[in-house]
Regions:
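A short glycine-threonine-serine/GTX helix/turn-capping micro-motif
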Residues: 71-77, 169-178
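C-terminal helix-rich "cap/oligomerization" subdomain common to oxidoreductases
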Residues: 189-227
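Short, flexible active-site-adjacent loop segments at beta-strand->alpha-helix junctions, enriched
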Residues: 24-27, 53-58, 103, 129, ...
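Contiguous beta-strand/loop segments that form the cofactor/metal-binding neighborhood of enzyme cores
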Residues: 85-155, 185-193
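A general structural signal for well-ordered alpha-helical segments in protein cores
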Residues: 6, 31-32, 83-84, 155-157, ...
Length: 227
């Protein structure tokens, strides 16, 4: 639920020489590899802006995991982790974090809008438990932009438009949670190789992302029991 607890898991895994990996399935989808190649090749030019949202509408349940602070409830850890992890993949560690939002009667984050700045680039992200949102994402740069259809965190359609007039629309992806097969296959390969960490989502990045969420919660005033 926070960076300190994640760091304890990482330290224990490294001390025992065993495999540990965050189950962030988006990182293991083929589209993520394509996005990484486009960024590495400079197809978008200098990246300036990342946009992403993830909102779903839930009936408030004070005892349910989404609204109960004792269960680390709130939009951030359940939904917001996807746009935040996406921004981390594209821009790396943020230099500054600015967040605003609303809190439920039970004391967890209901809705959060945030800006993560890395150098001159910014990620503008939103997450909410109060409404269903398009769950789309985009990356814009000096040479063009890339759009991901909703929900962007699963198998999504990519659309590339460049200032030079290049337009690419990829075919329909596999649907829904069938995309979890790529995460499972990657984990199986790591086990077969005797690896202790995934190169696609290093453990230090997992801890760093949670540290970002910790800072967002600090700004909002969300504290879990025992912290």
């Amino acid at each position: 639920r926070n960076a300190a607890e994640a760091a304890q898991v990482v330290a224990a895994a490294r001390a025992q020489g065993v495999l540990a990996m965050e189950a962030m399935w988006t990182r293991f989808l083929p589209q993520t590899d394509v996005i990484g190649q486009l960024l590495a090749d400079g197809v978008l030019g200098e990246v300036t802006t990342v946009l992403a949202d993830h909102g779903q509408s839930f009936e408030p349940d004070p005892q349910g995991r989404l609204f109960n602070p004792a269960l680390a409830g709130g939009a951030l850890l359940d939904l917001g982790i996807y746009p935040i992890s996406f921004a981390s993949f594209v821009l790396g560690a943020p230099d500054t974090v600015v967040a605003t939002g609303s809190i439920t009667d039970t004391g967890v984050d209901a809705q959060v809008s945030l800006t993560l700045a890395t150098g001159s680039a910014q990620a503008c992200l939103n997450t909410t438990l109060l409404a269903r949102t398009p769950t789309r994402a985009s990356i814009s740069g000096s040479a063009g932009y890339l759009e991901l259809s909703g929900p962007f965190y699963g198998p999504a359609r990519l659309s590339l438009d460049t200032t030079a007039g290049r337009v690419v629309r990829d075919p329909d992806p596999i649907t829904g949670h069938h995309g979890l097969c790529f995460e499972a296959a990657h984990l199986a390969q790591l086990v077969a190789d005797g690896a202790t960490e995934s190169p696609l989502l290093p453990l230090d990045e997992t801890v760093r992302i949670l540290a970002t969420i910790d800072e967002i919660r600090r700004q909002l005033g969300v504290v879990y029991p025992g912290e």
